[in-house]
Regions:
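Low-complexity or membrane-interfacial segments used for flexible interactions
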Residues: 1-36, 44-46, 54, 86-91, ...
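Central antiparallel beta-sheet cores of small beta-barrel/beta-sandwich binding domains
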Residues: 31, 60-62, 83-85
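Acidic (E/D-rich), amphipathic helical modules within compact regulatory domains
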Residues: 37-75
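Helix-adjacent hinge/juxtasegments
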Residues: 67-94
Length: 190
């Protein structure tokens, strides 16, 4: 699948779609044009590769007491961006560039927003599911933010975080809720 340059598409309404098959991979599209892929490497933990028409990045979660996600140019050693995870808010810092806030859009909505430090929304990312499976997501960008050079990296970094969080929640599903396995049958008392 050929990827087209991000600057050549409408950046107001984008969508992430999960690929078919067992591989964990998503494609970011605008209309019929694919602009990026995000693919997890089998057996490599949280390591993922994002590919665009112009660049290839690696993303990885790190830290335990101070969790974070880094994005680097593939094969590079320095961070292009870092998403620092805090209890009530998260922060995206771009190397040599601006910083952004990344947080839930609301308590009951699984959507996330990326805003400037002044509170100006840059992107709204909303996961889409079928049952309990994450199948994609919508990325809505205000017209005033559509020409930001870092927009594609922000969309990839935000989606990476959302997918990891979703998969961690999926791992807990068998332990809770109405779909939880039935407890073993007990023998009747004598």
């Amino acid at each position: 699948m050929a990827l087209v340059p991000f600057g050549s598409v409408d950046r107001i309404a984008l969508r992430w779609l999960r690929g078919p098959g067992p591989e964990t991979a998503f494609t970011l599209s605008s209309g019929d044009a694919n602009v990026a892929t995000l693919r997890w490497t089998e057996g490599a933990g949280s390591l993922a590769t994002a590919e665009t028409a112009d660049a290839q990045w690696t993303l990885k979660r790190g830290g335990f007491l101070s969790p974070h996600i880094t994005a680097r140019k593939a094969g590079g050693r320095s961070d292009l961006a870092r998403l620092s995870v805090h209890l009530s808010y998260h922060r995206i810092e771009l190397a040599g560039g601006p910083s952004y806030r990344f947080r839930r859009a609301g308590l009951l909505v699984p959507a996330w927003t990326i805003t400037t430090d002044d509170g100006v929304e840059v992107a709204h990312i909303e996961p889409v599911r079928e049952g309990r499976t994450l199948v994609g997501g919508a990325v809505l960008v205000p017209a005033a933010a559509a020409d930001r050079p870092e927009l594609l990296l922000l969309a990839v970094l935000g989606w990476y975080f959302i997918v990891l969080a979703w998969f961690e929640d999926e791992a807990l599903v068998p332990l809770e809720g109405p779909d939880a396995p039935d407890p073993p049958a007990r023998a009747a008392p004598p």
